[in-house]
């Protein structure tokens, strides 16, 4: 029987696996640069963790959660996002005693309709910085995100920001928003009619609803927030300008999870390859999330990104591997053993692909493996010395390499000089 992958999943190979590795490495490099510590959490968690952090009425919990009952009658969920598991691990293991900046990367799961840049199993990365928030911590996260995308040579995006206040400050606004949207309930999509009862904010940045005139004319949250809250937002905008970071304020940007407070942001692609789903990464501040999970009453800020969406916009031509392909082969077992020893002695200094069987010299030069190589290492026929030839396949320039004491610097120099 021939099996196929499940709907909403994908296999990564060749170009896709190269892109995965490039994005992951770029993210890890940026995280280390900004002094974030890697945190790995289990793929499975208690369902209640996500209900507590995302809200019982969130789309994530109501519609997208992969959950099941295990043999011990526990309600288990495949993690749909990384913030809640990361904060759970921080609290459970008392990690704040040693550090307060963490990052994660791995597979997540959401039961939703697969589309370009969105899968049911997907790779996601993110960061969490637990510290009292200020415009300077906010802008530092923007620096991190920009550095990450710059490393990937992605520059066709815009930074969209908003200020949504604390949950208590939003109550009055939510009442006005619901009253306003109730007038247009018959014009809302079915999912938005449900949101209107318990999660009206989500209607504002829904990709379909946000295009409707009555949604564009909805009350704006800034008209309902206290002056001192907005002053922080204005100060943050001034910092953006002082650092010459272009941005756009979108009063309807709210992000998809209920725990956000004050500053929220998205890096939105202007690349036409992405279709409707254009957010490359997004995040914001949360004020009481750590306390909700039994930790200290400390604010935090973070962002998350989906690997699949970024894969759609990076260009592999910007990440060409300049390493030359070197293939070693032998016509007898003794020579093969000598070549394998030579290859192992080089370690990571020089990459050599060794054909692990005795070959016929006349036939091997016609093989695909040799045709795709830049340099060849082999022992010349009838050569009784402890030496092999390193040969440029294109110009016939040759370097004799001593098998007993190979001069690695000479080999590297030869490869460099004969690589043009």
Curated annotation (Swiss-Prot):
Catalytic reactions of this protein: tRNA(His) + L-histidine + ATP = L-histidyl-tRNA(His) + AMP + diphosphate + H(+)
EC number(s) stated in the UniProt entry for this protein: 6.1.1.21
Swiss-Prot/TrEMBL keywords: Aminoacyl-tRNA synthetase, ATP-binding, Cytoplasm, Ligase, Nucleotide-binding, Protein biosynthesis
GO MF terms held by the record: ATP binding; histidine-tRNA ligase activity
Subunit structure: Homodimer.
Family in the record: Belongs to the class-II aminoacyl-tRNA synthetase family.
Protein name: Histidine--tRNA ligase
Species per Swiss-Prot/TrEMBL record: Mycoplasmopsis pulmonis (strain UAB CTIP)
């Amino acid at each position: 029987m021939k099996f196929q992958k499940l709907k909403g999943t994908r296999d990564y190979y060749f170009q896709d696996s190269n892109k995965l590795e490039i994005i992951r490495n770029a993210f890890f490099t940026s995280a280390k640069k900004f002094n974030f510590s890697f945190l790995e959490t289990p793929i499975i968690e208690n369902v209640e963790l996500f209900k507590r952090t995302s809200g019982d009425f969130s789309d994530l919990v109501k519609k997208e959660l992969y959950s099941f009952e295990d043999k011990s009658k526990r309600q288990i969920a495949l993690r749909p996002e990384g913030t809640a598991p990361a904060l759970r691990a921080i609290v459970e293991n008392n990690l704040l005693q040693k550090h307060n900046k963490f990052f994660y990367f791995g597979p997540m799961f959401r039961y939703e309709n697969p589309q370009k840049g969105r899968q049911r199993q997907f790779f996601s990365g993110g960061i969490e910085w637990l510290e009292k928030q200020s415009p300077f911590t906010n802008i530092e996260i923007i620096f991190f995100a920009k550095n990450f995308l710059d490393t990937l040579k992605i520059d066709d995006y815009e930074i969209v920001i908003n200020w949504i206040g604390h949950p208590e400050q939003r109550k009055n606004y939510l009442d006005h928003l619901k009253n306003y949207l109730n007038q247009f309930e018959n014009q809302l999509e079915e999912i938005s009619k449900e949101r209107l009862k318990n999660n009206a904010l989500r209607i504002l940045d829904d990709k379909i609803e946000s295009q409707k005139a009555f949604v564009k004319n909805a009350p704006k949250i800034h008209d309902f927030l206290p002056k001192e809250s907005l002053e922080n937002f204005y100060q943050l905008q001034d910092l953006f300008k002082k650092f010459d970071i272009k941005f756009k304020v979108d009063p309807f940007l709210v992000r998809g999870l209920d725990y956000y407070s004050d500053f929220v942001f998205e890096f939105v692609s202007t690349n036409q390859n992405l279709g409707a789903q254009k957010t490359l990464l997004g995040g914001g501040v949360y004020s009481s999330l750590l306390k909700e999970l039994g930790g200290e009453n400390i604010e935090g800020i973070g962002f998350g990104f989906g690997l699949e969406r970024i894969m759609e916009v990076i260009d592999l031509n910007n990440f060409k591997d300049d390493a030359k392909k070197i293939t070693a082969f032998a016509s007898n077992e003794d020579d093969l053993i000598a070549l394998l020893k030579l290859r192992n002695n080089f370690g990571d200094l020089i990459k050599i692909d060794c054909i692990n069987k005795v070959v016929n010299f006349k036939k091997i030069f016609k093989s695909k493996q040799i045709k795709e190589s830049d340099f060849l290492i082999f022992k010349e026929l009838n050569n009784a010395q402890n030496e092999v030839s390193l040969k440029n396949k294109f110009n016939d320039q040759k370097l004799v390499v001593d098998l007993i004491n190979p001069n690695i610097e000479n080999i590297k120099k030869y490869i460099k000089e004969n690589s043009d």
